[in-house]
């Protein structure tokens, strides 16, 4: 790992539009980033790798089990709802209980945003996998949106694993890469990210340093 990784958990508030310095409309997603707290620091000596664990979101302490209660007490922080670990070579620079906010990022940097996509329910192959479908005419009978063949008959005599078929669509962990942070509002703890990010409004998102690109 060559570069330091920064990250923060937050809540997707929704989309809006702002104007840049050239008076062009820029669609942005507003993310309420943090505040997160550092609950664990992993080092090469004790764990074999370097990483920092951050926590986010309020939770009723009565809903936290005993192992997690002890984990949060060791870091001297109140229990949080979500935990995530970021592997980064500068993990030793973090301290237990340290607060991580939107200020870890600057405007103009590239980030990857991870969230849980919207659930679409049971969907066919045309919606779920972008299949073309069968012909609208020329003798096609009531099979216009079907997948077509899903395998041979006697050879191989089965359906291969991974065959794209109808099924539940969405509600999966999705990462959108190389998005640009348009602006940072440190006072309100907001990140304005150019473009769309996965998930519904109010959903949990992880904003971290881009894995690819500059």
Curated annotation (Swiss-Prot):
Single Gene Ontology MF annotation: rRNA binding
Pfam family, one: Ribosomal_L3
Region (Disordered): 133-153
Any GO CC annotation of this UniProt entry: cytosolic large ribosomal subunit
InterPro entries: Ribosomal_uL3, Ribosomal_uL3_bac/org-type, Ribosomal_uL3_CS, Transl_B-barrel_sf
GO biological process: translation
Alphabetical UniProt keywords: Ribonucleoprotein, Ribosomal protein, RNA-binding, rRNA-binding
Source organism superkingdom: Bacteria
HAMAP family per record: Ribosomal_uL3_B
Role played: One of the primary rRNA binding proteins, it binds directly near the 3'-end of the 23S rRNA, where it nucleates assembly of the 50S subunit.
Family: Belongs to the universal ribosomal protein uL3 family.
Subunit and interaction comment: Part of the 50S ribosomal subunit. Forms a cluster with proteins L14 and L19.
Protein name: Large ribosomal subunit protein uL3
Naturally occurring in which organism (per UniProt): Streptomyces griseus subsp. griseus (strain JCM 4626 / CBS 651.72 / NBRC 13350 / KCC S-0626 / ISP 5235)
Gene name per UniProt: rplC
